């Protein structure tokens, strides 16, 4: 009798549990899926990685003449101002909310070597060569982070939000010379009293920006999408005065004998920018990074 009463008492809970499972199944069925049953839109906990979609679009524009570049391009002067070499990542806190980050590390080194015969060599053939070497280095690091809110139906999603951007760049020039400043080279007529020349030049730039954005994203395959984004940036950028080191062969103390010395000089000017810009083709990542076309993959 007790077992019968217990069974009857549990019937409502069984029906409630079944109804809840059925409701969850219906919600699950309402999610947008591909023909193979794969979810198309991102979910809470997903990670997205994106990059510049311009090369893909340029390839499509040139399909009519695949062996040549017809000159058609998806990029305009203001395209992804300062962000064309930046990785974009997102983490979905919720189905319709994501934190996003940007990271760009760009480095360029250029070296120019000029060769010439050693003027002090007595050789008539196979004359030894000396070289002047000029190096130019440019390093840039860009960090960005923000919050993205999303809404929409089916494959087309809209998004909007804001992000904070930090950038730092360092520029350096160095010079190395085949003919040194010394007494021997002065005696040979290769160096003259009062001569001077640069050894290196250094300058850094710091930038800070606050940017709002709005855009649309279309999922052409499960967890794969193209996005178009437009933004407005409020930014500040400041260059250091820069420092230059020069070497001298002279007689600053009036002793009657030239000697070698180096001296460092501060730059005469310092440049800073503050402003609000929108898709204006600015070369600074802090002033906009406005229009953007991206290809994104969600995992």
Which stretches of residues belong to each language-model region?
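Bacterial Sec-dependent N-terminal signal peptides
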Residues: 1-24, 295, 299
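Residues on the lipid-exposed face of transmembrane beta-strands in outer-membrane beta-barrel proteins
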Residues: 51-53, 87-91, 105, 143-151, ...
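Short glycine/proline- and aromatic-enriched beta-strand/turn motifs that initiate or cap beta-hairpins
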Residues: 20-94, 98-102, 106, 112-113, ...
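Extracellular/periplasm-exposed beta-strand and loop segments of Gram-negative cell-envelope proteins
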Residues: 58-80, 104-141, 167-207, 235-290
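Short, contiguous, well-ordered secondary-structure segments
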Residues: 35, 40, 140-146, 150, ...
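Short coil/turn segments at secondary-structure boundaries
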Residues: 3, 131-135, 150
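Outer-membrane beta-barrel channels and translocator barrels
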Residues: 44, 94-96, 151-156, 219-221
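Short connector loops at helix/strand junctions that flank enzyme active sites
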Residues: 82-84, 94-96, 138-144, 155-159, ...
